[in-house]
């Protein structure tokens, strides 16, 4: 089966700074992948390339069989900062198909409610792929857990392909089929860790020794990396 998203030797430079170095990654149709790594490892850069907001300096990305040359309706994007139009009501923010929300402005909503609205708006457009850049990062711990469960419930019904960036290792393991660990300076793929835990995910799974073992493996991978220099990378070291 062909992957839904393919990063093929993707390189991204900002002037003399190498942000992404030869990223190769396939994400299967219907897969839920989380991406973790230290600050500056290129997680958001990779997602912006996947959405078409950035064009890579080298290599390319395919969605299905089509090269990504810009944003497209088959890709929905959800950001940490909610990305709602403050001058529109909640109803208007999700007007692509959801009509049973209250006629309130986003400023009247809590953080969790704003993010529910943003996710609902993305889902209402019926994208094949959801690109999520730390969508729960600004939420309190309890709301964050509830949002994780709601997202997994929606994903389990429709199995859209999800690429989800997070700094939270527990969140990465709880949500994903696979955890993509990136390394920094330059940003590159470090390793891929499978999450062999059943769905639906529950509180019992969070507390299980199997979950702890995977979490510890991801934690060790993220926090025990040595950044390379551009010169080392260019020599393949």
Curated annotation (Swiss-Prot):
Enzyme Commission code: 7.-.-.-
Alphabetical UniProt keywords: ATP-binding, Cell inner membrane, Cell membrane, Membrane, Nucleotide-binding, Translocase, Transport
InterPro entries, sorted: AAA+_ATPase, ABC_transporter-like_ATP-bd, ABC_transporter_ATP-bind, P-loop_NTPase, RLI1
Annotated membrane topology: Peripheral membrane protein
Pfam families for this protein: ABC_tran
Keyword Hydrolase (UniProt): no
GO molecular function terms listed in the Swiss-Prot or TrEMBL record: ATP binding; ATP hydrolysis activity
UniProt subcellular location: Cell inner membrane
Family: Belongs to the ABC transporter superfamily.
Function: Probably part of an ABC transporter complex. Probably Responsible for energy coupling to the transport system.
UniProt-recorded name of the protein: Putative ATP-binding protein BMEII0108
